[in-house]
Amino acid sequence: MTDPIKVFGNVGSPYTQKMLSLLRYRNIPYSVSWGDVVQNLSFLNIEPPKPVLLPTMVFKDDEGLDICRTDTTPIIRYLEELYEEKSVIPSSPILSFLNYLLEDFADEWTTKYMFHYRWYFNEDADNAKKMLVLQHKIDIDDESMNQFGDIIADRQINRLWVVGSNDDTAKLIDQSYKRYLSLMENHLKFLPFMFCLLYTSPSPRDLAR
């Protein structure tokens, strides 16, 4: 592939940041469009995926037609087939399995930390909603920003149960997060990557952390 990969994402999306980190590290050409994915795809007459997830990345199929992909884990493996340089998948089957396991942990569990700390506490939610509004439009008056922000915040706060964040689990999530930070801090004092004893470049697990 020679054409830049089209990435449609959100600044606040950890999965968008995960894939941008991968593309930058592997020197894979890409262009990124921020904001409303469906709207941005419509500008290019590209049919959005179902469901629309972040990021949405556009590739060419065998007939040269645009096709959207959204799940970061298989996208990373697909990119391994397209580009040979600076592979991020450990060649050892054992390390590859551990990488897959830890990447899944990062994607499915550590995102609970993000959603919890972003939307559970009122002060954090107030800050998050303003940042997300300004991502879509920076020339906006305070009243409109607050109205738009309240819509975003209500939607996200009402969905906290989806990631398991509530009054009963708040303490567990906080304890898990602090334990995770402690383990990562100890590991990174001696090694720059998760698997660098035998593998000297970042893995998808590193990109997802």
Regions found by a protein language model. Name each.
Residues F115, W119-L198:
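Extended alpha-helical scaffolds
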Residues M1-E143, M194:
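GST-like domain detector, emphasizing the conserved glutathione-binding G-site
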Residues Y199-A208:
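Conserved small/polar residues in nucleotide/adenosyl-binding loops
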